Amino acid sequence: MNIGFVSTRFAGTDGVSLETLKWATVLEEQGHQVYWFSGLSDRDPEVSMCVPEAFFGHPEIDWISERIWGCTQRPAIVTERINEMAGYLKSMLKRFVSQFQLDCLVVENALTIPVNVPLGKAITEFLAETNLPAIAHHHDFYWERQRFAVNAIPDILDTSFPPRLPNLQHVCINRQAQEQLSLRKGVSSTLVPNVFDFETPLADSTDDWAANLRPELGLAEDDILILQPTRIVPRKGIEHSIKLISMMEDPRCKLVISHSTGDEGYEYRHMLEKLAQDEGVELIIMSDRISDTRHVNRHGQRMFTLWDVYQQADLVTYPSLYEG
């Protein structure tokens, strides 16, 4: 089968991108052909369609998002621009399916969390109109995020996040999400937890590439690398990691955060930077040096995998308030 993955982003080392790669690897091993549709992509261009408007950080999507969250009424112009963008994205989805002769779509979180509302609406309409078989792989639902609680799009959330369609099968990553989906939407789903590939050996942590990580981050030989291997979002509870290191009262302890802020803005990051300064904790954010593969970037810098950082860490902190 020709299978198309659809999301806002397939790039870097965010959870959705990493988990999707695992699915794609298994499907390819079974003889299927895999293709990619997203707004930001680091996949092979030969098997990808990158449409910038599908990315949650596109200016038009930002304009829409600013006017639908934190309020309960939307002007007609907002509805018009949502529909206009959804129509365009639907046409690009049609082109994607036609170009690669796709038999099935796997929608990764784009029908789950409404960071790009027009994309979710476009996917829903496209699936309803074509009856193309599809899987919605749900990583974190909008009702799990406080910032989506007050909104001006209850109609769209009800119909598209996620939709109830006979040709759409749902997959959840844990039982709690599965139960909430059934309770709120009245649809059944399959449970497929996120897993590690234990059969693939890890890279040698003593090799020259991994050994360069500490000095390239500015760490001394006797510094203690404390790793926070998450995005900078409030539910990760990173302030507790900073407090912990402050209580250790050892200037050699450095908190290294592997990922960036993602789709939730910079307010939390600024708060953490201020807290770290007040607590005397050195904070190193290395998101621009993390990739899913080792390589040298266009600036001549080594790019490290998340496993490189794990292997160089002395301690890992993960004080999440809740997880998917």
Could you tell me what each predicted segment is?
Residues 9-11, 111, 229-233, 260-263:
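Short donor-sugar binding/catalytic loops of nucleotide-sugar-dependent glycosyltransferases
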Residues 26-29, 33-104, 274-278, 283-293:
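A conserved catalytic-core segment of Leloir-type glycosyltransferases
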Residues 77-84, 93-119, 133-137, 318:
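Short N-terminal targeting/anchoring amphipathic segment
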Residues 151-204, 208, 271:
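A short, active-site helix/loop in glycosyltransferases that binds the activated sugar's phosphate group
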Residues 220, 266-308:
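Nucleotide-activated donor-binding/catalytic signature segment of Leloir-type glycosyltransferases, i.e.
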Residues 321:
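Aromatic "clamp/platform" in nucleotide-sugar-dependent glycosyltransferases that forms part
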